[in-house]
């Protein structure tokens, strides 16, 4: 049933000129400088147009089932990740232990950890540093980070320590994220801004992405981070609009998340990218995914990424289905958002 519905959806998109969107940046040569302009050029060059959005072949399906408790099915072969390793991976892990820093890569048991830390196919080593502690004030059904209504207070020296640590590594791109801190008056936004500013002072050319919580939709908090000097302002909507209340904490919602992204676009310096992500395999339908993409596009978001949800433990929300690589590719080529990236593996 999913196969036929997905194919019909693709044909509808192909025939609808009103939904044709493409990047406004011309493709460039394969080699791009490690700058924000280079990042924008690379994204534009790698993002196909709607004309490349073709039907799935008859022997492909949207997803495969995950089985039941009584009759579990093994992971598909494309979901089996390699064991982490490599010089950069070892170096980053050693430094994290020495400095007692937290990463969402480890806290959330992200299956992409090895590829990101080692540099992957591009050789660009990335890491996602988690600030404001390792305890979240919210409890989303998919997330492995521990929770508490009253987490320990933030370390006032953390922005400087994190900046100095990251500056000493051989990273080209760093993502700074955090747990939700509903217990703090500023939701932790000033901590974010200080960390970005101190890191930029030490490494002006390093690309910095701030993956922030929703700050309860507070415009002042969003503005503070958006004007901190970052290159990419990211906030994840996590899932399609129709599944928000099922998957996310009750204090989060789709409209509030889109509002945060739009406010960031208004306040950030011209050229700053905005980005969001959703998980697939949570029970969503292809129609719901496309509808969500359209609303993300209407909100002016530059980059949207997709990932297969992977259950971090038996206590968490089960995987509904494993979405096939072919289906991921069809979403990527839909061009409903300026730049669409995808990964088969994601944990949060």
Curated annotation (Swiss-Prot):
The pathway noted for it is: Protein modification; protein lipoylation via endogenous pathway; protein N(6)-(lipoyl)lysine from octanoyl-[acyl-carrier-protein]: step 2/2
Give the keywords, sorted: 4Fe-4S, Iron, Iron-sulfur, Metal-binding, Mitochondrion, S-adenosyl-L-methionine, Transferase, Transit peptide
Q: PROSITE patterns per the record?
A: RADICAL_SAM (PS51918)
Q: Which of this chain's residues are annotated to bind [4Fe-4S] cluster 2?
A: 136, 140, 143
Key word Transferase present in the record? yes
Name where it's found. Answer: Mitochondrion
Name the enzyme's class.
Answer: transferase
Q: Which SUPFAM superfamilies match?
A: Radical SAM enzymes
> Which molecular function terms from Gene Ontology are attached?
4 iron, 4 sulfur cluster binding; lipoate synthase activity; metal ion binding
Q: What are its E.C. numbers?
A: 2.8.1.8
Q: Does the keyword 4Fe-4S apply?
A: yes
**Positions that bind [4Fe-4S] cluster 1:** 105, 110, 116
Protein family membership: Belongs to the radical SAM superfamily. Lipoyl synthase family.
PANTHER family from the entry?
LIPOYL SYNTHASE, LIPOYL SYNTHASE, MITOCHONDRIAL
- Name under which the protein is recorded: Lipoyl synthase, mitochondrial
Instruction: List the gene name.
Output: LIP1
